[in-house]
């Protein structure tokens, strides 16, 4: 089966590799254009583009599927398009180019968490279970009928990044199975049912920590936005990032945002009880263990996050 693969970030790579390993004829890759990365903002290809270059696959780089891009896709004569985190909408006119349309691998149990950041929202919301589905892409936002599902329990220490990595691998197997069924003529898609929730793309502001809410909600926020867009607060007027924390229900005397030292541990108060920060990044520094930051800063008495 001739497959156009549409994807951009590293999370899409397991699916590309799985399709190739299963013997699908990947006739081309659709990905976002090169983008600036790092502090020096050097232009670099997307992870999918970089891998496609290594494999010698034709690459279409586009932020939007205008008429010219649609013509490029049509020239590849794909029977189906597999899409995994491409990062842009597919217009109705492009949906009919492949014989079997576009089949999307989405990292939630639809119709829960439709949108660009389903895994992060699931962690922030405190969901116990999530998963991935393959579905037929249509004009609506993640509304198409579902071919298959895999489920994944959300662990108490899961970050959005770690959970997404696991789902990218289990989802790649599901995508391969779905396309195999489509090729064999045995695939069945079922309309979505159940409560709908939305998962819009997270902004930098979504990473701001509100220490006035209960500790569990603070922990979920930190885990959900790690690694993207990242959790942060303000200390002495400068941004202060947090990458890992754990609950400390034994310490309830701290006011929200108030810092305290307990041995080598860095504690901060919330709306219920303290949390212990494990990895932090002060302004202008690299990410470090909170204990190392404590040794460098000395006393934290009187310090309050958010000021």
From Swiss-Prot:
Residue sites binding (6S)-5,6,7,8-tetrahydrofolate per the record: 108-111
One GO cellular component, as annotated: cytosol
Ribonucleoprotein listed as a keyword: no
Catalytic activity, EC: 2.1.2.9
Broad enzyme group: transferase
Keyword Transferase assigned: yes
MF-aspect GO terms: methionyl-tRNA formyltransferase activity
Catalyses which reaction(s): L-methionyl-tRNA(fMet) + (6R)-10-formyltetrahydrofolate = N-formyl-L-methionyl-tRNA(fMet) + (6S)-5,6,7,8-tetrahydrofolate + H(+)
Keywords: Protein biosynthesis, Transferase
Similarity-based family: Belongs to the Fmt family.
Role description: Attaches a formyl group to the free amino group of methionyl-tRNA(fMet). The formyl group appears to play a dual role in the initiator identity of N-formylmethionyl-tRNA by promoting its recognition by IF2 and preventing the misappropriation of this tRNA by the elongation apparatus.
Protein name, per record: Methionyl-tRNA formyltransferase
């Amino acid at each position: 089966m001739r497959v156009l693969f549409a994807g951009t970030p590293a999370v899409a790579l397991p699916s590309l590799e799985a399709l190739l390993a299963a013997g699908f004829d990947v006739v081309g890759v659709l990905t976002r254009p090169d983008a600036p990365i790092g502090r020096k903002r050097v232009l670099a290809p997307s992870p999918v583009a970089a891998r496609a270059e290594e494999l010698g696959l034709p690459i279409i780089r586009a932020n939007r599927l205008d008429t010219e891009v649609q013509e490029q896709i049509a020239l590849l004569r794909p029977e189906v398009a597999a899409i995994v985190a491409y990062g842009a909408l597919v217009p109705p006119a492009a949906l009919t180019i492949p014989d079997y349309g576009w089949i999307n691998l989405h990292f939630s149990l639809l119709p829960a968490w439709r949108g660009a950041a389903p895994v992060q929202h699931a962690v922030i919301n405190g969901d116990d279970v999530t998963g991935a589905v393959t579905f037929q892409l249509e004009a609506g936002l993640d509304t198409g009928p579902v071919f298959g599902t895999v489920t994944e329990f959300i662990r108490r220490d899961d970050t959005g990044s770690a959970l997404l990595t696991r789902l990218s691998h289990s989802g790649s197997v599901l995508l391969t199975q779905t396309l195999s069924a489509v090729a064999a003529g045995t695939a069945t898609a079922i309309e979505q049912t159940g409560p709908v929730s939305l998962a819009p793309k997270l902004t930098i502001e979504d990473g701001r920590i509100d220490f006035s809410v209960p500790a569990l909600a603070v922990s979920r926020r930190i885990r959900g936005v790690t690694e993207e867009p990242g959790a942060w607060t303000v200390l002495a007027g400068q941004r202060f990032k947090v990458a890992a924390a754990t609950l400390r229900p034994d310490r309830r005397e701290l006011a929200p945002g108030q810092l305290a030292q307990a041995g080598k541990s860095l504690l901060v108060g919330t709306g219920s009880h303290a949390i212990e920060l494990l990895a932090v990044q002060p302004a202008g520094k690299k990410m470090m263990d909170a204990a190392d930051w404590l040794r460098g800063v000395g006393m934290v008495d009187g310090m309050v996050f958010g000021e």
